[in-house]
């Protein structure tokens, strides 16, 4: 830590608050450099954190955390927060098995008020915490930091609408690191922000309100005049003022002096406050500033050169999906691709560039994405919703009410199904089979390799009803790709004939199942379809084998294995059944391989579980 003389002194925000204000720019420089060095050695989210260094320092300097409670939305930008709150020496373990969590996590630190990972939850939770604090006369400040992407979600506006109506004391900070909201940042804005947040202006404002309460017409006129003054400087301010917030900004989020002055003023204000700051994602590191998307989440890399490692492995399942999407769009102009702010992650970059008129990025709006697809289907188009398993949870009612009940031809391409790995419990795709298979009219498929994935996407696209294909994060296995053709719906594939034991595989754990089958001389069936199930195959296996083993990368509760048991129970087969899958717990972070091994879903673990079951059976 000899390169970080001030940062090495900071083991908690209390240490930070002992420093002089004129030392804070150096703290910011050291913090940014330390963040860059540590993430380059471990992997993780980089660009967002580089952009919030000054804000993080200012917040912990002005507010008495953890008594004053700081809530980060999503949490990608919270690495500097972790470094300043006693976890500096453990940053090399972030996102690793048994290491510190990739996002703010209540169990990890008293400074992490809300466990996060999904977007747009901070203001709702912050409002609840603020209401509780007011009821207890706690006297603490509640601060929510939300990005310009997360604030586009409906939940954020629902919370602000409620907070404005209640007039609850809380501060919402919009970290605006894109050009989409406002470009008005400069000396004038910083100066006006000090005025609007200052004690003199605020006192006059509050006193005037009390006087004007007896004169409603004049009060309304003055309110509109104030809103207009702010609106001239920042047109977006009118929206937040109408929601009941006192809007300040935008100000330069990298000017530590202005942040300190403005936050000091706003700390004393009553009611819902809104501070708009402008930052640059990747600030201070040229490669990240030039490519903030590429440096959003990074593997280990050489930060001196800024070169990210190039993958020489087989294509990812996301890439396989993207290639299928382009191939299909070439033949069908009725195809419409939809993503809720996951263009890069879902493999849709090429599609969006080649077919811009057939592509919609609806931002962080999963509910809207699904119902938009329903409307397009009603209009005669063939929508494909590309969405992560963990984010599909946010649109569950829309899948049922707007798609399935109406039996509309919408294809859900469910990425990141199963174990995702380093992002931990909030991002594992553990539940989609369980919450989807109970929905009538829905066809659900789980490919065992990239060729099967293509064929299933094609089958779902052509079936004329709601369909879902779930596939994992990461690289495919390198099998040869066939020309597109439709699979027979509800029919499985016998992969290996054995005796006594039959492994019914759902998804990409098939290679592990085959390894085990060679040792145990087991039959292996790639089930392909979770819904409708191949009843004929299940009945045949139950009659000719002593033990059925279901294998899936989904929680066992309510998953594909449970569906097999339902079939066996209805037919009253006398056969032993072992369900292998994810446990009834939230699965922690680690590499995919580490997590599968720990859950005994690698080949060795599967064999061990089957042998233990056979001893009991």
From Swiss-Prot:
Name the InterPro entries for this protein.
Dxylulose-5-P_synthase, THDP-binding, Transketo_C/PFOR_II, Transketolase-like_Pyr-bd, Transketolase_BS, Transketolase_C, Transketolase_CS
What UniProt keywords are attached to this protein's entry? Answer: Isoprene biosynthesis, Magnesium, Metal-binding, Thiamine biosynthesis, Thiamine pyrophosphate, Transferase
* Pathway the protein contributes to: Metabolic intermediate biosynthesis; 1-deoxy-D-xylulose 5-phosphate biosynthesis; 1-deoxy-D-xylulose 5-phosphate from D-glyceraldehyde 3-phosphate and pyruvate: step 1/1
The residues forming a coiled coil are none
Q: What class of enzyme is it?
A: transferase
User: What's a Pfam family this protein contains?
Assistant: Transketolase_C
Describe how the cofactor binds: Binds 1 Mg(2+) ion per subunit. Binds 1 thiamine pyrophosphate per subunit.
Q: What EC numbers are recorded for this enzyme?
A: 2.2.1.7
Q: Does the keyword Glycoprotein apply?
A: no
Gene Ontology MF terms: 1-deoxy-D-xylulose-5-phosphate synthase activity; magnesium ion binding; thiamine pyrophosphate binding
Any one GO biological process: terpenoid biosynthetic process
Cofactors per UniProt? Answer: Mg(2+); thiamine diphosphate
Self-association state and partner proteins as the record states: Homodimer.
Report the function annotation for this chain: Catalyzes the acyloin condensation reaction between C atoms 2 and 3 of pyruvate and glyceraldehyde 3-phosphate to yield 1-deoxy-D-xylulose-5-phosphate (DXP).
Task: Give the family this protein belongs to, as stated in its UniProt record.
Answer: Belongs to the transketolase family. DXPS subfamily.
HAMAP family tied to this protein: DXP_synth
Quote the protein name from its UniProt record: 1-deoxy-D-xylulose-5-phosphate synthase
Report the gene name: dxs
